[in-house]
Amino acid sequence: MFQLPILNFSPQQVAGVCETLEESGDVERLGRFLWSLPVAPAACEALNKNESVLRARAIVAFHGGNYRELYHILENHKFTKESHAKLQALWLEAHYQEAEKLRGRPLGPVDKYRVRKKFPLPRTIWDGEQKTHCFKERTRHLLREWYLQDPYPNPSKKRELAQATGLTPTQVGNWFKNRRQRDRAAAAKNRLQQQVLSQGPGRVLRSEGEGTPEVLGVASSPAASLSSKAATSAISITSSDSECDI
């Protein structure tokens, strides 16, 4: 009878391999490595207490769509604060994806808020402090720096930036997509405003028998005036630097 080879790795060595594969973003190899680990009770007990191994199992479960297993791992093992950001992102993203599949459509901000209220973070990956669902200033700074260098990062760069910020590659990709949309909208509104302003001052006419001048021209047109106001209003909205994780 064929038997699987026995890997004589210590729990510390296993944890080191898991951390290396996690940092590389190679989830497929990480999954194969976890599958090859020994199943002896003594070895399993030691590995089941190792945070790096548990975090790796959670990541593999998430990427494999095995959300029940992911929730079980996160709810039944206490993780240190260093792992909280990544595991919280997995917890929320898994519930978002389940809700999207159930509803058959992408979730809006209100939908995501309701999902978070229905499935609060377990205390095993949360220290009890309220989460604003907005990225921290350091995270926003890194994202903006990378965006200025390359608004269209490839998957490898997304994984690298996710590792640096504690976000998931999906969150990084969504941030870049939203930022590009905001910049395009702001540029379009700026062009519209410049077109309105470039028409120049209106013609000044004086009504017969009246001393008050009447200004006529593009700016006096109700439609043009409305366009100008809309452009100014839209610019003030789209140029806001809001990177909330909603």
Curated annotation (Swiss-Prot):
Residues with PTM Phosphothreonine: 212
UniProt entry tagged with the keyword Transferase: no
Tissue expression as described in the entry: In the developing embryo, expressed mainly in the ventral optic stalk, optic chiasma, the neural retina and the primordial tissues that give rise to the pituitary/hypothalamus axis. Not expressed in the lens placode.
Family annotation (InterPro entries): HD (IPR001356), Homeodomain-like_sf (IPR009057), SIX1_SD (IPR031701)
DNA-binding segment(s): 126-186
Feature: compositional bias, Low complexity: 219-246
Gene3D superfamilies membership: Homeodomain-like (1.10.10.60)
Family note: Belongs to the SIX/Sine oculis homeobox family.
Name the record gives this protein: Homeobox protein SIX6
UniProt lineage: Eukaryota, Metazoa, Chordata, Craniata, Vertebrata
Protein's gene: Six6
